[in-house]
Amino acid sequence: SDVYKRQTTYNREAYYESMDIVATVEANATAQSAPYLNAEDIVRAREINQRMRELDIHHDPEEFTQLNKEFHSVLFSKCPNERLKDLVVDQWKQLEYHRVSTFRYVPERAQESTREHEQLVSLIEAGAEPAYIEKVARQHRLSTLNTYRKKND
């Protein structure tokens, strides 16, 4: 029905907006966190990313999504701005409200995503400029969103 169609369109737009906000705040929190991440954090991030690589995305998109959250949590964990960290988590909850495991719909994005994770970790490890880390982190999120949009619009 028309009402249903409008509702779905609205929900989809709301989901896109939440994804866009997450891309922005998460990337900023990651950039602020980067200088404070230590060797242990780097190892932890790589371990999670490795687990993501080994998962069968077609059978377990929810687990992949969960590990993705854990991975990004490590990267922004040392952000000195506590309210910004809270904002990221709040926006994640907004995404969960839509109950979309993005990777269920775009499994082809999973492999690419873990490669981008490694790139991010390497940049942080190398002490790259926070502004550059922020740009790469934001692009990483938006690539997932764009892949999802292409499939669903």
Name each model-derived stretch.
Residues S1-Y4:
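Short, small-residue-biased leader/transition segments that mark boundaries at the very start
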Residues Q7-T8:
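Conserved active-site beta-strand element of glycosyltransferases/polysaccharide synthases
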Residues N11-A14, S18-Y36, E70-P107:
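Hydrophobic, amphipathic alpha-helical faces that serve as interaction scaffolds
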Residues I21, L67-E70, V136, T147-Y148:
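Short, solvent-exposed amphipathic helices
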Residues N28-E54:
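Amphipathic alpha-helical dimerization/coiled-coil segments
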Residues E40-A45, L84-V88, Y132:
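Acidic/histidine metal-binding catalytic segments
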Residues R46-N49, R53, H58, V100-D153:
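C-terminal all-alpha effector/ligand-binding and dimerization domain
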